[in-house]
Amino acid sequence: PLWGQSQDPLNEDQTTVRILEGDNSDPSIVRYGKSYYLVHSSFVYTPGLVVYKSDDLVNWVPCSTALTTFTGDIWAPDIVFHNKRFYIYFPTLNGKGKKTNMVTWADTPEGPWSTPVDLKIGGIDPEHVVGEDGKRYLLLSSGALYPLSDDGCSITGEPVRIYKEWEIPEEWDIEGVSMEGLNVKKVGEYYY
């Protein structure tokens, strides 16, 4: 389930509220007007990438489905609003074992959503980033920063590695070697 907190976490009287039932891992939220829109991993379920709407971050209702046909095993999507259009970037593992990242877009979060476009790059946890120059990029958990076309629907060049995966000692029993669940925001002159 996806959980929310209705009190200050340091307050002894805190209350935890379940806001969505089921497996809702890797949520991504965007605010548009007075409403919030959320997508989460949909894995192999079809329809996939259900878009939820909320005006209070507690009560959510489905408002559209970005994928109406099977696209593959989908996880860790990133929903963004840029230049008057909504985009969902997502990694997928198709039925033949190929990993790639795709994008679908719509003029409103209620859809209709476009047929997904294959960006032809592997990696997980895509994060849409806009540089100081207004150019668009897609950052992956490996630290690869790919330049995007102006419309955000194709990769236009080779990636720049902005950080490298961690060097893990061989004797450690660990699964991950890079950051996951990226969320990059610019505050002042720095990106966080």
Enumerate the predicted regions with their spans.
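Carbohydrate-active catalytic/glycan-binding domains of CAZyme proteins
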Residues: L2-Y192
